[in-house]
Amino acid sequence: QIDVESTARTILIRIREKGAFSSGSALLNTSFVSVIDKIAGALAQIEGRIAVEGHTDNVPINTFAYPSNWDLSSARSVAVVRRMLDVAPLPPSRLTASGFADTRPQAINTTVDGRARNRRVEIVVKQPLDEQSGAMLREIR
């Protein structure tokens, strides 16, 4: 239920809803807490800003706790950030939490599988420029 992608200075960790959260909930599944703990421990060892982003499918939610998918996606990202801060020596200034609701789908929302792929939390690590890249950018400016 976890995918990891890496480019030059970005690491993307994609967590599918089914592993981390029950449907319509922002409470981390107890079976998944250790996974978040490992991710947090690993991220504490590297530099960079960490953006935790919550995403949903386009099926409306309207509960007392989560009146909309905006609320649910935001609450899920905050739950992950809180857990990471609780278990790893991460400065809070390195982390942000954002909810995107259904505005950034990965798949079409017309199928069960597509909706499942869209329900996710992504941890995006933006690593700082190395000295050579930084010098090159300064020259361009």
Predicted regions and their residues:
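Beta-strand-connecting loop/turn residues
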Residues: 9-11, 48, 102
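Short edge beta-strands and adjacent turn/loop segments
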Residues: 2-14
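Structured segments of extracytoplasmic/periplasmic soluble domains
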Residues: 39-49, 80-83, 87
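Short secondary-structure junction motifs
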Residues: 1, 47-49, 92, 118
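Periplasmic OmpA-like peptidoglycan-binding domain that tethers envelope proteins to the cell wall
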Residues: 14, 20-33, 55-137, 141
